[in-house]
């Protein structure tokens, strides 16, 4: 199965931010071949459980993995899996007709107070 990431979707930055981390990439690679709980991920990747939990939360919120609660030895455990074999990024291009609709405003340095 593949995941299509479109550059014109509002959630694209969430997905890219989730992918912009070496530990999260390692977790994704591990989950591509395993269906396991957080403790198993932490042990296999030699990471702290709290760190794995934080990274898994980011990946789940971005829709890159799926986690579900299942009965465990003591209470419930969170079991995770990667639902995708491929990630495709579709860059949306502007049509030539739309380029003329862009507005440009000259702003002198220091003429603004908020930026990111």
Features from the language model and the residues they span:
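A short acidic, leucine-rich amphipathic alpha-helix
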Residues: 27, 40-46
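Key DNA-contact positions within bacterial/archaeal DNA-binding proteins
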Residues: 49-50, 57
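Alpha-helical residues within the helix-turn-helix
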Residues: 43, 54, 60-61
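Beta-hairpin "wing" of winged helix-turn-helix
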Residues: 64-75
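N-terminal leader segment of winged-helix/HTH proteins
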Residues: 1-17, 62
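Short capping segments at the starts of secondary-structure elements
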Residues: 24, 33-37
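Short helix-coil-helix linker/hinge
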Residues: 17-24
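Conserved segment of winged-helix/HTH DNA-binding domains
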Residues: 12, 73-113
């Amino acid at each position: 199965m593949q995941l299509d990431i479109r550059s014109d979707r509002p959630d694209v930055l969430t997905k890219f931010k989730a992918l912009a981390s070496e530990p999260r990439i390692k977790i994704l690679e591990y989950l591509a071949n395993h269906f396991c709980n957080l403790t198993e991920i932490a042990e296999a990747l030699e990471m702290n459980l709290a760190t794995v939990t934080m990274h898994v939360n980011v990946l789940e919120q971005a829709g890159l993995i799926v986690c579900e609660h299942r009965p465990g030895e003591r209470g419930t455990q969170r079991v995770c899996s990667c639902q995708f074999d491929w990630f495709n990024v579709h860059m949306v291009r502007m049509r030539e007709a739309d380029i003329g609709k862009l507005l440009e405003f000259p702003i002198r340095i220091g003429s603004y107070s908020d930026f990111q």
